Amino acid sequence: MTDLHKEWEKVQEMAFASWVNSVLEKRGGVEKISDVSTDLSDGVKLIFFLESVSGKKFPKKFDLEPKTRILRIQNLHLAMLFVDEDLKVKVQGVAAEEFVDNNKKMILGFLWTLYRKYRISVINEGDKSSEEGLLAWVKKTTDGYSGVNITNFKASFRDGNAYLALAHKFDPSVFKYDEFSGKDQIERLNAAFDFAEKGLGIPKLLDAESLSKGNVDERSIILYTSLFFHAYRAKEEREALEASQNSLANKLASLEQSLEGEKTSQDELARQKKELEESLRLIRQQNEQRNQRIADIQSKIDDALRGIDDEKMAKLDLESRLSKTEKDKAILELKLAETLDENERLRNKIEEDKKRAAAEAEGLGLLRTHIGHQITDIAKWQSFLDNPEAVPYTKTPVNLEAELASLQFEEQAKRLGSKVENENISLEKYLSLKEEELKSAGAPKKRTK
């Protein structure tokens, strides 16, 4: 292992032990650790640390006093699952056995991953975060200090001016920054480390000579510098808390003064108490009355809801009946339409029958008149032939009209036709007879011998 790696490992051990202890101290009731490679091997303190640093409750039950290797591995396995599944932190190649076997390299790698997530990744300055955000924060914080030029972690911190400026900016009353301008790099670095340890509570993680020569791993510089950032943030939080406490104290003092100035006599307080008690009694009475009204209203609502349910059932029944009625109505309308069509057909037929009857009546009248004339003419001929000197007959015999009046149209027509035919036959016979008589009268009689 190279000296650089050894230095980096030493820095990590000190930094991570300090970080873990600061987290466990806030939790309370947990003994501090001194060696990260051995004091986390049973998984108990590691689980407490993970809960506190993440703010999440450990979801599984674990053994608080694991006596055997298997029980310690079980605890650590649950811790690894918690990191992976709940904290969403991916740690490659680190298993529970690494902690049980005190594999310092793997344990430090595991803690470095957690440190980057919870202590470096949370650093933001402007539009930059993590390492870039940390570098931007240092540049902003040390702005205006002579001899400070922040460009990167590898070269910008070797002369000690950056760390001196950070320590001075934190508390300018401790020392004067300019008094170290003539000192060499190692002196400035050692002074900065001393001021940081005493004023900011930052442990001496780096070796001044190694840092001045550029023999310190960049990750060690980032880790040490991040402690300044969190010291500043802790100071800001303390100042904000103190300001809040002072504000609260001022408000309490003002309130006490107001109360002192507004004290009233015991009689006034007693009177106010009595009034309040009476008001309270009235309020309780009103509450009881209101509760009773609410109960009555609720009862009415329940009745109304039951009525609504009944109405719904009645509505469904009515809708069912209406549906059947609509069907019946459609059938009746169809039958009505058919009936109306039939009535129309019958009216038309009646009209036609009326017209036909009128025509038949008119024809019958004409036929009766015509037949009557014929009968009259026949009667005239009969009368004339019987008595040529007699007045011509002009009236249809009465017995014929009476006979026809009692018959239907077809019977009248048939009777008249038969009558005319009979009259014609009678007339022909009569004429034949007369003709024979005339012939007989005109022929010479035979002489008798």
Swiss-Prot record:
Per UniProt, the keywords (alphabetical) are: Actin-binding, Coiled coil, Cytoplasm, Cytoskeleton, Repeat
Enumerate the GO terms in the molecular function aspect: actin binding
Residue ranges of every copy of the Calponin-homology (CH) domain listed in the record:
10-119, 128-233
Q: Region Actin-binding: list its residue ranges.
A: 1-231
Q: Which cysteines are joined by disulfide bonds?
A: none
Coiled-coil ranges (or none):
232-364, 408-441
Q: Supply the PROSITE patterns for this chain.
A: CH
- Work out whether the entry's keyword set contains GTP-binding: no
Keyword Amino-acid biosynthesis on this protein?
Answer: no
Identify the stretch annotated as signal peptide in this record. Answer: none
Localized where?
Answer: Cytoplasm, Cytoskeleton
Pfam families to which the protein is assigned, alphabetical: CH, Cortex-I_coil
As for what it does, the entry says: Actin-bundling protein. When linked to F-actin the actin filaments form preferentially anti-parallel bundles that associate into meshworks. Plays a major role in cytokinesis.
Could you say which protein family the record assigns here? Belongs to the cortexillin family.
Question: What interactions and quaternary structure are annotated?
Answer: Homodimer; parallel.
Q: What is this protein called?
A: Cortexillin-2
Q: Which organism is it from?
A: Heterostelium pallidum (strain ATCC 26659 / Pp 5 / PN500) (Cellular slime mold)
